[in-house]
Every structure is written in structure tokens, then in C-alpha cells.
């Protein structure tokens, strides 16, 4: 689903129906959470299905309840895939700007927001604003912002790969 659709959904539901303030971090967080949910859900389902049925059957056969089977066998074995999907979803949300533009996170904010309903901006939009400014001094800020964003993306994706390789068990 294109990310702009999630921005329109956030605009319709969170701003028009729930009457939350424009460019509030809580609205941006809810829109990005909705956007990353499909990635996390698909990774979680794939990770849960990857656990062999013989492990479930063996736990049930030894007298474990369904809750104990899920809690002690299924979740620990599928946790690396779940964490990997979560981190990849978060790294996708880190670089998104289209849904946040739809809810009004475009202004330059001078002060640090004091609450979740104060106006705020995000780094991809701030990079765009710095790049579109004609002043020469913003060129260094743009480059630094891009480097910070890329560093976070590389670290998050590296963490996802590390978690996947470190905790994945071979059947």
C-alpha cells in the first residue's frame, strides 16, 4: 500500500474525526504505526509458521497446555523473525515523509515540543526544507541530516540482520 494512503487515512480519522491537532507527534506516531503494521504482521505470521509442527505436537504430547506450548516453545523460536520484522518496519517508518506531509508536519519548529500534542517536525521533512532553502548555510545542515538519517537506517538494518543470525535456530 502506498504510504500516501496512510497519510490520507490519518488525515481523515485522526484529524477530522478525532479532532487531534495538526502536526502533533502523537498523530504522526499513530499514522506511522498503522503504516508499519502490515510489515510486522506479515513477518510475525511467517516466523510463526516457520516453527515445525513437530515441536508443537511434541509439547502437547508431553502434557503442555496450548498456552504453555505457545509461551515456552512457539514464541521463543519465532522471536528472531518477529524482532527482525519489527525493526525493518521501524526503519521503513524512519525515512517516510509522505504520510506525515498529509497530516501537516511541514513547518519549521523553533522550540522543542513540550507534549505529544505540540507542533513538531521529522528529519526527512526537515532535510527537504533545508534543501529547498536558497541560503548557503543550510547546505551543511542538509548533508548532516542525510548522514544522520542514513546512519540510523544502516544501524537498524544491521541490528535486524544481527538479531536474525544470532538467535535463529536451525531445525
What are these regions (language model features)?
Residues 1-32:
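Generic hydrophobic transmembrane alpha-helix motif, especially the helices
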Residues 23-26, 33, 37, 55, ...:
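Alpha-helical membrane-protein architecture signal
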Residues 43-44, 66-104:
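Transmembrane alpha-helices
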Amino acid at each position: 500500500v502506498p504510504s500516501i494512503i496512510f497519510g490520507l487515512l490519518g488525515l481523515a480519522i485522526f484529524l477530522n474525526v478525532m479532532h487531534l491537532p495538526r502536526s502533533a507527534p502523537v498523530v504522526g506516531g499513530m499514522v506511522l504505526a498503522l503504516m508499519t503494521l502490515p510489515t510486522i504482521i506479515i513477518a510475525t505470521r511467517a516466523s510463526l509458521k516457520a516453527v515445525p509442527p513437530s515441536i508443537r505436537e511434541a509439547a502437547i504430547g508431553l502434557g503442555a497446555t496450548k498456552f504453555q506450548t505457545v509461551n515456552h516453545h512457539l514464541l521463543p523460536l519465532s522471536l528472531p523473525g518477529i524482532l527482525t520484522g519489527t525493526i525493518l518496519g521501524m526503519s521503513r517508518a524512519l525515512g517516510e515523509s509522505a504520510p506525515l506531509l498529509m497530516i501537516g508536519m511541514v513547518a519549521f519548529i523553533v522550540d522543542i515540543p513540550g507534549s505529544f500534542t505540540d507542533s513538531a517536525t521529522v528529519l526527512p521533512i526537515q532535510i527537504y526544507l533545508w534543501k529547498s532553502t536558497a541560503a548557503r548555510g543550510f547546505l551543511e545542515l542538509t548533508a548532516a541530516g542525510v548522514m544522520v538519517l542514513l546512519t540510523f537506517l544502516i544501524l537498524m538494518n544491521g541490528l535486524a540482520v544481527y538479531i536474525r543470525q544470532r538467535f535463529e535456530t536451525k531445525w
